[in-house]
Amino acid sequence: MAAVLIVAAVVGTALAGSGYWTLWQSRNSSSAEPLPASLIAFPERKPLAEFILVDDEKGVFDLKSLESRWSFIFFGFMYCPDICPTTLYDLSLVKREMVALGIRQSDIQFVFISVDPARDKAAQIQRYVQYFDPAFLGATGSIGQLTNLTRQLGAPFRAEPETSTNVYEVTHSSAVYVVDPLGHYAGIISPPFVASDVAAQFAELYRANEGLELALGD
């Protein structure tokens, strides 16, 4: 089984269209290993600060929405012609592989967050993501609300000014961000995604942290 790579203080930034991400390492970067795997798990996890977004199911998607399960967060937009639908499809395969490895569906959730709130509305986003998997979640928010979360995860985005034809470009991260059941930023998955590899790497992380949600009451 592929081992989960652990590196020191990593922040990933991926830009749509180029499909690459840049890795910053801490002063201990000399001890970091090569990068053979898609999933990078952080040795020290940073707790996320409060944020508020909007979803179609409960009306509010916030920090509490990430508690008690592992969350896989992908930022994009519905008008995205390639990276977003491809990544969501890949994540549906990743989920299937995870379940096949014995990971409980109730312990994981996949969240697509639109960074194009001018065109993408919560109800539309939810219908869009459910095309890939009925359990996938969708959310969005104002630019300020989105920035509050994306800055915490190191997931830059930029939308061009709106036009009269409502056609414009949106630049966003192509990575998937992993948050643990305590609401801590736990890792990053960089493309290209090989479903079986990502699932196997996460299975190690998952089993090493089984029962983590119990600490919520501490």
Regions found by a protein language model. Give the residues of each.
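N-terminal targeting signals for export/organelle localization
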Residues: M1-E50, A208, D218
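Short loop/turn microsegments at loop-to-beta-strand junctions
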Residues: L48-A49, W70-S71, S173-A175
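Short, acidic, Ser/Thr-enriched surface-loop or helix-capping motifs
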Residues: D55-D56, D180
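Short active-site neighborhood of thiol/selenol oxidoreductases, capturing the structured segment around
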Residues: F61-L91
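Conserved helix-turn-beta segment immediately C-terminal to the redox Cys motif
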Residues: L88-F112
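Thiol-based oxidoreductase modules, predominantly thioredoxin-like and allied folds used
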Residues: I103-D120, A135-G144
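Short, internal strand/loop/helix patches
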Residues: Q126-S173
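Thiol-/selenol-based redox modules, centered on thioredoxin-like
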Residues: E162-D218
